[in-house]
């Protein structure tokens, strides 16, 4: 089962690397 918290963690894990590279 995938919870909302898991989805948020996945989104953060995918977004943060891009944010670090962009900034």
UniProtKB/Swiss-Prot annotation:
Entry keyword set: Chloroplast, Plastid
Cellular component terms (Gene Ontology): chloroplast
Subcellular localization(s) per the UniProt record: Plastid, Chloroplast
Record protein name field: Uncharacterized 2.5 kDa protein in tRNA-Arg-tRNA-Asn intergenic region
């Amino acid at each position: 089962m995938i919870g909302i918290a898991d989805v948020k963690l996945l989104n953060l894990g995918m977004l943060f690397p891009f944010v670090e590279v962009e900034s």
